[in-house]
C-alpha cells in the first residue's frame, strides 16, 4: 500500500505549534497537536506529540486510546498493546478498544489473548457487526474453524451485505473441507459483486475440490475476460487444466502466467510437472530447480530426484544428486536424534513398521498385499503400518484387515509421527516410497527406529545415512553392479517382491501376429517414462521390420504428443502407431491381446508394467544401463528365465527384435506357456518374499543387537523354511 501524500500543516496544527512555543509545558496543546497530526496521517509526528503530552501530564490517560491505533498503524505492536491495555484500564467497557487490542494481539501471534479480547468486545457490542467480525477473524487465525464459522455467520446475520465476512466464511468452510458450503458463499459474493476476482479464484478452487473442474475452467475463463492479464487467475486455470489432463493447454497457460509476473514455486512446480509428463525433461528440471531455489523443501527435492531418476544416465551425477538430499535435509536433524531403548535380544518378537502413502489402488499395494497377508501369521513379527494418505479405498480396507495396528499419519508432522513410532517401540522401520510423492524421508532422517530400510517404492537410494538397508534381490541389484550408488547396504533376498496378478486379467490370447500377418510391438508405460532416446531406438527396430506396427497404451489427453513427434522425427509415420487411451485395469490387460512383444523404456525401465505383460503372455525386450533404475525390468524377466530378452546395446536390441519377428512359432509357444513359467518361478510364490523378508529382518536385527554397523546381507532360497507357498529348492 502506498503511503498517503504528505499534508502540510493545517491552520489548526499551526495554531497548536504557536501555543506550544508560547507554553511548551502545556500538555493539552501537545495533545491537540498530536490528534490533528494523526488526522492528516502524519503518524510519526502525531505519536511523538501524544507521548509528549502524556509525559507532561499522566492524568491525560484517555489519550492512550488515540495513541494505540496509531502505534499499531506504525507497526509498533508491543507499544500498541501496552497503550491499549492502559486505555482499557480507564475505559473497561469500550468495545472498540478491546477489538483494537485483539487485532494487535492477533497480528503479534498471541492468539489466545486475541480471542479473549475479541470475546470481551463482542460481549460489549453484540449487535455491532464490525466488532463481531473481530472475534471471527481471531478464531480463524487460531485454527478454531468451527467456532470461526459460527462467528462469521453471526456477523452476516447482523450485516447480510458484508462481503468480506461472506468471503471469510467461505475460506473458513474450505478449512473445514466443506467445499460445497464454501462455494455457496463465493457464489453469493459474485451475485453481488460480479467482478470480484478473489471470489472467482476461491470458487474455482472449491469446484475443483468437488470434481467439477470443467465448471471451474469456465469460471476462470469468465474472470479472465475481466482481467485478461491476471497472472494468478492464469495460474489457477493452468492448475485446473493440469488436473483435467489437458497438459498441452496447462503448459501454455502456466507459461503465460509465468511471463506476466514472477512465478511462485507452485506455478514452477506445476509447469515442471506438465513438461515432465510431456517428455520435456530439460525444461521440467530447470523449473523444478528454480522452485527449489525459491522455496527449498524436502518434498520439492524428492520430486526433482524422481525426475532425474527417469532422465539421467550418468550414474555418478545421479548418485551425487541423491546424496545431496541427505546432506541438505538429514544433516540439520542429526543433533535432534535420540537413543533407542529397544531391548537388544536377537531372538525376541520384532515390531516392524511400514511407512507408505501408497496403500490404496497403487502398484506398491499390489506387491505388498500378499506379504502383509502372510506376515500376519508370523509368530515372530508384529506388523505396524503408518499410512500417509487420505485415500481410503477397497485396497486400503483389505490391507488394514491384515495389519490391525494401523496408524493414520497424513497431516501429522515428523515430530508427532516419531513420538508415535517410539511409543509403538518399533524395532525396524521400512520405507515403501523412496523419493516418490508423499514420502516421509525427513521422518526417517530423524532415525525414529534403531534399524531402517527402504523397499519397493523407488528404484534408487534415499540418500540418507539414517537408512541402513535397501531391500532387493540378486537379479534386481546384481552383486557389485550398483552398490556404490547407494548410501544403504544392499539386502539381497531370493525375490525383491511378489507380483499378485489382477483378478480382472483375462486369459492369455493367441499370438496376434499369426492372424495379423505382421508383428506388433507395444509399450504400456507412463508417457513420462519414455525418453527421446528410447523412441529413437524403438524406431530403428521399426525401420528394420518395415511391416511392423507399434501400440502405445496408457495415453490420455494428448500426453503422448511429444512421443508422436519423436517417432515422426525418426521417420515412423502415424499410420504405424496404434494409440490406446488409459482405461480400466481389465481393459488395459486385455489390450495385451494385440501385442506380440513389449518394449521397456530407459533409463527408467519399471517393473509393474513388465509383470502385467508377462502375466498376459507378452515378453518385454529391454536394455540395461549404468544406473539402477535401468535394471528393474530385467529383474523379473531373469526370474522367469527370460534373460535372453536383454539387449546389451542398440545393435543387439535391433537384431534381437528382428530375430523374434521372424520366429513367430517360438514367440507363440512362449506366450502359451508364460503363465506356467510365471507360477512355477519364485515370482509366483509370495511365501518366498514373506519368508525371505522375515529372515532378512532377523539378520538385520542381529547385526544391531551385536552393536555392529550395517553390512550387505544375502538370503538364499535354501535358507527358507518349506511350506505350501514355497517352490521346491
Description of each model-found segment:
Residues 355, 524-525, 553, 580:
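Short hydrophobic "strand-cap" motifs at the C-terminus of beta-strands
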Residues 601-603:
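A short structural motif in glycosyltransferase catalytic domains
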Amino acid at each position: 500500500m502506498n503511503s498517503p501524500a504528505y499534508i502540510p500543516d493545517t491552520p489548526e496544527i499551526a495554531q497548536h505549534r504557536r501555543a506550544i512555543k508560547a507554553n511548551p509545558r502545556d500538555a493539552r496543546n501537545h495533545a491537540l497537536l498530536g490528534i490533528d497530526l494523526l488526522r492528516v496521517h502524519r503518524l510519526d509526528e502525531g505519536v511523538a506529540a501524544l507521548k509528549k503530552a502524556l509525559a507532561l501530564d499522566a492524568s491525560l490517560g484517555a489519550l492512550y486510546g488515540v495513541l494505540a491505533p496509531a502505534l499499531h498503524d506504525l507497526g509498533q505492536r508491543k507499544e500498541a498493546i501496552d497503550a491499549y491495555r492502559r486505555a482499557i484500564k480507564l475505559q473497561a467497557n469500550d468495545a472498540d478498544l478491546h477489538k483494537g487490542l485483539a487485532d494487535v494481539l492477533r497480528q503479534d501471534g498471541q492468539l489466545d489473548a486475541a480471542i479473549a479480547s475479541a470475546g470481551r468486545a463482542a460481549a460489549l457490542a453484540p449487535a455491532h457487526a464490525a466488532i463481531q467480525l473481530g472475534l471471527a477473524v481471531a478464531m480463524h487465525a487460531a485454527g478454531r474453524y468451527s467456532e470461526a464459522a459460527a462467528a462469521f455467520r453471526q456477523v452476516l446475520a447482523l450485516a447480510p451485505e458484508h462481503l468480506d465476512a461472506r468471503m471469510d466464511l467461505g475460506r473458513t468452510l474450505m478449512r473445514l473441507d466443506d467445499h460445497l458450503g464454501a462455494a455457496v458463499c463465493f457464489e453469493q459474493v459474485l451475485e453481488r459483486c460480479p467482478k470480484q476476482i478473489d471470489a472467482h479464484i476461491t470458487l474455482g478452487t472449491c469446484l475443483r475440490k468437488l470434481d467439477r473442474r470443467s465448471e471451474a475452467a469456465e469460471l476462470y475463463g469468465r474472470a479472465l475476460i475481466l482481467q485478461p492479464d491476471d497472472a494468478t487467475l492464469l495460474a489457477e486455470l493452468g492448475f485446473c487444466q493440469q488436473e483435467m489432463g489437458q497438459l498441452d493447454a496447462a503448459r501454455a497457460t502456466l507459461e503465460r502466467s509465468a511471463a506476466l509476473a514472477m512465478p511462485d514455486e507452485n506455478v514452477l512446480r506445476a509447469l515442471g510437472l506438465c513438461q515432465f509428463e510431456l517428455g520435456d525433461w530439460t525444461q521440467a528440471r530447470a523449473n523444478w530447480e528454480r522452485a527449489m531455489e525459491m522455496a527449498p523443501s524436502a518434498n520439492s527435492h524428492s520430486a526433482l530426484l524422481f525426475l532425474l531418476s527417469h532422465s539421467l544416465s550418468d550414474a555418478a551425477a545421479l548418485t551425487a544428486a541423491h546424496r545431496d538430499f541427505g546432506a541438505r535435509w538429514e544433516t540439520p536433524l542429526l543433533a535432534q536424534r535420540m537413543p533407542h531403548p529397544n531391548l537388544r535380544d536377537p531372538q525376541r518378537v520384532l515390531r516392524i513398521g511400514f511407512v507408505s502413502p501408497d496403500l490404496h489402488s497403487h502398484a506398491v499395494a499390489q506387491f505388498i498385499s500378499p506379504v502383509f497377508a502372510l506376515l500376519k501369521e508370523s509368530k515372530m513379527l508384529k506388523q505396524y503400518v503408518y499410512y500417509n494418505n487420505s485415500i481410503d479405498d477397497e485396497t486400503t480396507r483389505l490391507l488394514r484387515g491384515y495389519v490391525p495396528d494401523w496408524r493414520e499419519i497424513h497431516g501429522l508432522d515428523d515430530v508427532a509421527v516419531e513420538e508415535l513410532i517410539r511409543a509403538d517401540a518399533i524395532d525396524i522401520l521400512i520405507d515403501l516410497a523412496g523419493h516418490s510423492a508423499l514420502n516421509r524421508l525427513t521422518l526417517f532422517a530423524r532415525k525414529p527406529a534403531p534399524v531402517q530400510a527402504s523397499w519397493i517404492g523407488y528404484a534408487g537410494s534415499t540418500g540418507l545415512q539414517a537408512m541402513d538397508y535397501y531391500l532387493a534381490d540378486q537379479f534386481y541389484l546384481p552383486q557389485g553392479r550398483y552398490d556404490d550408488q547407494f548410501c544403504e547396504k544392499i539386502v539381497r533376498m531370493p525375490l525383491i517382491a511378489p507380483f499378485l496378478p489382477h483378478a480382472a486379467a483375462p486369459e492369455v490370447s493367441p499370438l496376434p501376429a499369426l492372424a495379423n500377418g505382421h508383428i506388433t510391438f507395444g509399450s504400456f508405460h507412463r508417457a513420462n517414462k519414455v525418453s527421446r532416446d528410447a523412441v529413437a531406438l524403438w524406431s530403428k527396430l521399426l525401420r528394420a521390420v518395415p511391416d511392423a506396427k507399434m501400440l502405445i497404451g496408457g495415453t490420455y489427453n494428448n500426453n503422448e504428443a511429444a512421443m508422436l513427434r519423436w517417432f515422426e522425427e525418426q521417420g515412423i509415420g502415424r499410420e504405424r502407431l496404434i494409440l490406446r487411451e488409459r482405461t480400466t485395469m481389465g481393459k488395459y490387460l486385455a489390450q495385451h491381446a494385440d501385442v506380440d512383444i513389449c518394449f521397456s523404456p530407459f533409463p527408467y525401465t519399471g517393473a509393474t508394467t513388465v509383470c502385467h505383460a508377462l502375466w498376459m503372455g507378452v515378453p518385454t525386450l529391454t536394455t540395461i544401463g549404468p544406473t539402477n533404475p535401468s535394471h528393474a525390468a530385467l529383474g523379473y524377466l531373469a526370474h522367469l528365465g527370460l534373460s535372453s530378452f536383454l539387449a546389451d546395446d542398440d545393435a543387439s536390441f535391433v537384431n534381437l527384435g528382428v530375430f523374434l519377428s521372424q520366429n513367430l512359432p517360438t514367440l507363440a509357444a512362449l506366450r502359451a506357456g508364460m503363465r506356467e513359467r510365471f507360477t512355477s518361478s519364485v515370482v509366483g510364490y509370495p511365501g518366498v518374499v514373506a519368508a525371505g523378508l522375515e529372515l532378512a529382518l532377523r539378520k538385520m536385527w542381529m547385526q544391531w543387537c551385536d552393536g555392529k554397523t550395517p553390512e550387505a546381507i544375502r538370503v538364499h532360497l535354501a535358507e527358507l523354511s518349506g511350506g505350501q507357498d514355497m517352490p521346491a529348492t
